[in-house]
Structures are given as structure tokens and as C-alpha cells.
Amino acid sequence: MIAMFTTLLMFYVSQNNIISLLIAIEILLLTVTVKIIYLGGQFDDVQSTMFALFIITLAGAESAIGLSLLVSYYRLRGKVTNIL
């Protein structure tokens, strides 16, 4: 799990395409959420499941905001390549 997280973190740092960055951030949040659920099951903690649900909700909101900004940028400029 740690190897997957660090690999995705390096992918996030090395990308210059905005869509790839959004996907990498979403997968990073999903990795953290899976780890929290796993540890909550190991220690029989219900609050970790609620926290994971909160993280998934925030990830969905972040994804919606990012994609709406991307669509707005595309409508304004006509292209999306190399925004960063």
C-alpha cells in the first residue's frame, strides 16, 4: 500500500497534463481511504469508516470542481494541453 502511494505521488509530481494530475489526486485519495478502512477494521473502529466516507465525499467534490474548471478553461481557450 505504501509503495502504491509513493508511486502515485511521484506520478503526481512528474505530470504536466491537468487531466493526469486530477486522476492521480483521485487515486491518491482512494489509496488513503482504503488504508483508513483497513486499519479501522483491524482495530474495530467505526469512526474510521465514517472518516473514510467523509474523504470520499471530499474527493468527489474536488473532482467536480476540478473538472468544471477544466471545462471552463476549454471553453475560454479552446484547448487544454499544457495548462501548467
From Swiss-Prot:
GO BP term (any one): ATP synthesis coupled electron transport
Keyword NAD included in the entry's annotation: yes
EC number: 7.1.1.2
Highest taxon of source: Eukaryota
Compartment list: Mitochondrion membrane
Membrane-topology descriptor: Multi-pass membrane protein
Enzyme class: translocase
Cellular component annotations (GO), alphabetically ordered: mitochondrial membrane; NADH dehydrogenase complex
Catalytic activity: a ubiquinone + NADH + 5 H(+)(in) = a ubiquinol + NAD(+) + 4 H(+)(out)
Keywords: Electron transport, Membrane, Mitochondrion, NAD, Respiratory chain, Translocase, Transmembrane, Transmembrane helix, Transport, Ubiquinone
Pfam families in the record: Oxidored_q2 (PF00420)
Entry's transmembrane regions: 18-38, 51-71
Location, primary (coarse class): mitochondrion
Molecular function terms, GO-annotated: NADH dehydrogenase (ubiquinone) activity
InterPro entries per UniProt: NADH_UbQ_OxRdtase_chain4L/K, NUOK/Mnh_C1-like
PANTHER family tied to this protein: NADH-UBIQUINONE OXIDOREDUCTASE CHAIN 4L (PTHR11434:SF16), NADH-UBIQUINONE OXIDOREDUCTASE SUBUNIT ND4L (PTHR11434)
Function: Core subunit of the mitochondrial membrane respiratory chain NADH dehydrogenase (Complex I) that is believed to belong to the minimal assembly required for catalysis. Complex I functions in the transfer of electrons from NADH to the respiratory chain. The immediate electron acceptor for the enzyme is believed to be ubiquinone.
Family statement: Belongs to the complex I subunit 4L family.
Name the UniProt record assigns to this protein: NADH-ubiquinone oxidoreductase chain 4L
Taxonomic placement: Eukaryota, Fungi, Dikarya, Ascomycota, Saccharomycotina
Gene coding for it: ND4L
